[in-house]
Amino acid sequence: MNKKDARIKRAVKTRKKLYKLDAIRLVIHRTCRHIYAQIIAKDNSNVLVAASTTEKLISSQLTTTSNKKAAAIVGKIIAERAIKKGIINVSFDRSGFKYHGRVKMLADRARQTGLSF
């Protein structure tokens, strides 16, 4: 089993637990260059809110899109958009990534902006 397969296995276990909770999920995905965040509905079919470093609004504020500063901006924007739609409580789905670095920064900034998880 390689590193990617192990991460996907962790992500599947987490998603099974969150599916049983029947909660709105804040899902993140991290690549070498970008970070993506989506808030997905309880029925796992609709993306309610999304933000990523590929958006012009966010990437224009940054010199690089692959650092903690970029993750913090994505966390702030996803939280603001969610609150605007009336979403305050979410479950955090880190997609098998370690809660460290950019993932932690995104989560912390989303909490500071007003999301609860």
Curated annotation (Swiss-Prot):
GO terms for molecular function: 5S rRNA binding; structural constituent of ribosome. GO terms for cellular component: cytosolic large ribosomal subunit. One of its GO terms (biological process) is translation. Keywords: Ribonucleoprotein, Ribosomal protein, RNA-binding, rRNA-binding. Coiled coil: none annotated. Part of the 50S ribosomal subunit; part of the 5S rRNA/L5/L18/L25 subcomplex. Contacts the 5S and 23S rRNAs. Belongs to the universal ribosomal protein uL18 family. This is Large ribosomal subunit protein uL18. The gene is rplR.
